[in-house]
From Swiss-Prot:
Organism, scientific name: Cereibacter sphaeroides (strain ATCC 17023 / DSM 158 / JCM 6121 / CCUG 31486 / LMG 2827 / NBRC 12203 / NCIMB 8253 / ATH 2.4.1.)
Keywords: Isomerase, Pyridoxal phosphate
One cellular component term from this protein's GO annotations in UniProt: cytosol
Active site: 35, 244
N6-(pyridoxal phosphate)lysine: residues carrying this PTM: 35
The reaction(s) this protein catalyses: L-alanine = D-alanine
Identification of the protein by name: Alanine racemase
Xref: InterPro entries: Ala_racemase, Ala_racemase/Decarboxylase_C, Ala_racemase_C, Ala_racemase_N, PLP-binding_barrel
Gene name linked to the record: alr
Job of this protein: Catalyzes the interconversion of L-alanine and D-alanine. May also act on other amino acids.
GO biological process: D-alanine biosynthetic process
Pathway(s): Amino-acid biosynthesis; D-alanine biosynthesis; D-alanine from L-alanine: step 1/1
Requisite cofactors: pyridoxal 5'-phosphate
């Protein structure tokens, strides 16, 4: 079979959620971010696993994502939508009982006129300049917005992956200035904010990347293994090139495995002649260019060529691969292609 297998450990995701939950006080609720199809790992199954672990609030990017998660979970858990109440979202918000995080005065007006009485939250801009009501806007609308009974006041940290960055304290101060005394539950922290400490936790945290094994949660359990099938093996003589543009040439007689995955499957071309795959625990260098559907790997040192080689797993996390590619683990995870066969179960040692 020429289809790669992406193994996703739901128990590890649940364990990561519990570990992050235990870092906060008992009166602080821990939500879960399942946007972008749970960072590419399958929101329906991931949300079920997190609900079993105890999560009761889920966060998605769009109302369409929220509808998918509601179909998977049924009634009960709250599903919050970061993009708020966009034009055309009214029916989805109503029919799937979604809670939009309203980001602007236009969105407040739209929501109150179309769905007065429907739950909502408010996103405030504490300095990231991306989404949310700015301090001046919030001052103008806070009175009637709070009177309408928001479920949550939230903001988002720009630099929480760097605990020493001064922006963290600046945003904390700005958020408190806008929300102290409101009596409404507050949320400022995703994974990085949880790790900053209790001052950033408030009444609700909303971890995302930490659930899926990513930085900055260094103690996270590995969540994914990506095993790529070997299609063909050949002997390459000294001086013979491999792959497009002859970017790699054999310096000695080499055994080269051609493996079924490429940039169409989310493996960036920047991995060309830089990445490492694994046969069990044995590293094998990627040689030549990453092409659309194929990569080539030097397996000369293996006593026997296996049926598959791993590019993600316990020996190489998405963050490790991202370092090699010059990107971030988020991008590696969310780019994992549709051609992979997704399997849910424990990661083999």
């Amino acid at each position: 079979m020429a289809t790669a297998t992406l193994t996703i450990d739901l128990d590890a995701i649940a364990a990561n959620w519990r570990a992050l939950d235990q870092m906060t006080a008992s009166d602080c609720q821990t939500g879960a971010v399942v946007k972008a199809d749970s960072y590419g790992l399958g929101a329906a199954k991931v949300a079920h696993a997190l609900a079993r672990a105890g999560a009761r609030r889920f966060f998605v990017a769009t109302c369409e994502e929220g509808a998918d998660v509601r179909r998977a979970l049924g009634s009960g858990p709250q599903i919050c939508v970061f993009s708020g109440h966009m034009e055309g979202d009214t029916a989805l918000i109503r029919d799937f009982d979604l809670t939009p995080m309203l980001n602007s005065i236009d969105q407040l007006t739209r929501h109150f006129e179309a769905l007065g009485g429907q739950p909502f939250g408010l996103q405030l801009d504490s300095g990231m300049n991306r989404l949310g009501l700015e301090p001046g806007e919030w001052e103008a609308v806070a009175g009637f917005a709070l009177e309408a009974g928001p479920e949550l006041l939230m903001s988002h940290l720009a630099c929480s992956d760097d605990p020493d960055h001064p922006m963290n304290a600046e945003q904390l101060g700005a958020f408190r200035a806008m929300t102290d005394g409101t009596g409404v539950p507050r949320s400022l922290s995703a994974t990085g904010g949880i790790l900053l400490g209790p001052a950033w936790h408030f009444e609700l945290t909303r971890p995302g990347i930490g659930l899926y094994g990513g930085r900055p949660f260094e103690n996270a359990r590995p969540v994914v293994r990506l095993s790529l099938p070997v299609i063909q093996v050949r002997e390459v003589e000294i001086g013979e090139p491999v792959g497009y543009s002859n970017t790699w040439t054999a310096e000695h007689t080499s055994t080269i495995a051609t493996v079924a995955a490429g940039y169409a499957d989310g493996l960036p071309r920047t991995l060309s002649s830089r990445a490492t795959l694994y046969a069990g625990r044995v590293p094998c260098p990627l040689v030549g260019r990453v092409s659309m559907d194929l990569i080539t790997v030097d397996v000369s040192h293996l006593p026997e060529v296996p049926e598959t080689l791993d590019i993600l797993g316990p020996h190489q996390t998405p963050d490790d691969l991202a370092d090699t590619a010059g990107t971030i683990g988020y991008e590696i995870l969310t780019s994992l292609g549709r051609r992979y066969q997704r399997r849910y179960g424990a990661l083999a040692a």
